[in-house]
């Protein structure tokens, strides 16, 4: 559903979108588990990897014009690879609904550091580096939520205290040696407490909500230093900013049909010196066929960058409501796509 969830997530996936939804469940739900949720996405819309290969190939052929053109094309490009997983155990309760959850995700970003202009473009290619940075975040927490009726209106409110362990990695490589596999060369780590919160209003199938994630901001410094690439020293060292993200959502959520929209109110600023800011708009739709098959589609776009929008499609299978297996794929371009799979069981 395009990654929406502020008003459309289930009580099992609520910790990852809006903890207030932990209190929204069916009367016959006694417990449930999400074991596991896995996803991966790849974004090389700038064709960084192809342009690195072009520059290396031209330099090896000793083709000066082609090398110079390849370096110019490579300048300003960026590539990203993200993947993650999650588990959750939900305990619906009319007093305080709870969901114990764990999550781990890794974000990798790479961009070139083009060497200064040189009369010899072959040497310029030898001196050019690819800088990479990665953050890995693992978190364990519990979502607690309560349903309330206020002035005749239906609300739920939720909090998710959690412990996070944050790892950062950096590397600097020549064009010829660059691989995303090399990204874990220099590592740092930090442990922190954080908090998510959310609220939901609903009236029949109509819903509106807001969520706040990582309400306690932190800045984590990566390792820094110099690496010799070709004939020059390349400096590295960045700061990863873990900042609050506020998202609003609205939707029509019925038994056999769902339509929802999410919008990030602010940008997520991540690594300094990398153009990796994120501010998402998401929209999604789901059609449920007799509670056995769910067909999903969606769209999302990063408003913080001049990038293409992404289409998503997925299917859920829930035979006899014993469990649910969901598979989804996303497509932006041949250079940017992703996939995910979820397995849920409720009792």
Task: Tell me the role of every PLM-derived stretch.
Residues 2-347:
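Subset of outer-membrane beta-barrel
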């Amino acid at each position: 559903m395009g990654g929406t969830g502020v008003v459309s997530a289930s009580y099992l996936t609520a910790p990852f979108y809006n903890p207030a939804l932990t209190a929204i469940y069916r009367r016959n739900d006694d417990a449930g588990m999400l074991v596991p949720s896995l996803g991966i996405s790849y974004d090389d819309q700038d064709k960084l990897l192809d342009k690195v290969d072009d520059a290396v190939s031209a330099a090896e052929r000793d083709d000066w014009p082609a090398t110079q053109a390849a370096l110019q094309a490579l300048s300003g490009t960026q590539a990203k690879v993200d993947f993650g997983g999650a588990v959750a155990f939900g305990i619906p309760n009319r007093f305080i609904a709870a969901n114990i959850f764990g999550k781990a995700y890794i974000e990798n970003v790479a961009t070139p550091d083009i060497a200064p202009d040189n009369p010899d473009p072959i040497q310029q290619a030898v001196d050019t580096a690819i800088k990479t940075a990665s953050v890995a975040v693992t978190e364990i927490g519990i979502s607690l939520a309560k349903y309330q009726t206020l002035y005749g209106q239906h609300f739920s409110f939720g909090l998710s205290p959690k412990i996070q362990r944050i790892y950062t990695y950096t590397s600097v490589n020549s064009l010829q040696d660059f691989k995303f596999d090399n990204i874990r060369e220099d590592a740092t780590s930090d442990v922190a407490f954080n908090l998510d919160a959310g609220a939901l209003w609903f009236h029949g199938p109509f819903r509106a909500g807001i969520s706040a994630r990582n309400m306690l901001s932190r800045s984590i410094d990566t390792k820094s230093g110099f690496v010799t690439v070709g004939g020059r020293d390349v400096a590295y060292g960045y700061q990863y900013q873990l900042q609050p993200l506020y998202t609003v959502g609205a939707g029509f959520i019925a038994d056999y049909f769902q339509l929802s929209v999410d919008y990030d109110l602010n940008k997520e600023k991540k690594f300094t010196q990398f153009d990796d800011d994120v501010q998402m708009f998401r929209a999604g739709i789901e059609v449920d066929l007799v509670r056995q098959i769910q067909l999903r589609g969606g769209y999302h776009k990063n408003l913080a960058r001049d990038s293409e929008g992404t289409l998503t499609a997925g299917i859920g299978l829930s035979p006899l409501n014993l469990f649910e297996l969901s598979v989804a794929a996303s497509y932006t371009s041949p250079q940017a796509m992703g996939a995910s799979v979820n397995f849920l069981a409720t009792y």
